[in-house]
């Protein structure tokens, strides 16, 4: 069955895997999902990811990150901009949770965080927030 909102599907798979305490989760491949995964690795929310190509279809295998006590590194991950209600923000992006969390944006500079957007003076579509 085709997925209408691929980013919401990506977020849901990560959230469900974290709650189930799975070490890895597989997500269908897209360039956007790969770029988001690179950003989440750089910011320390996931351990690593690997793009795996098979004869049927490529997918991304994400290695989730947990604390020493077994708590997921991602406490909250929520979609902001949805297909029915797109949310755009100018260059004056506010901090999420006073800087403890991040907004992930799709901008003219690519997939970036709210902090990077403020530094570069660009805005964009707020894809999701993560804490």
Curated annotation (Swiss-Prot):
Asked if the Swiss-Prot or TrEMBL record annotates the protein with the keyword rRNA processing, the reply is no
> Coiled-coil ranges per the record?
none
Q: Which GO terms describe its cellular component?
A: ribonucleoprotein complex; ribosome
Keyword terms:
Ribonucleoprotein, Ribosomal protein, RNA-binding, rRNA-binding
Question: Key word Acetylation present in the record?
Answer: no
Q: What does this protein do?
A: One of the primary rRNA binding proteins, it binds directly to 16S rRNA central domain where it helps coordinate assembly of the platform of the 30S subunit.
This one is known as: Small ribosomal subunit protein uS8
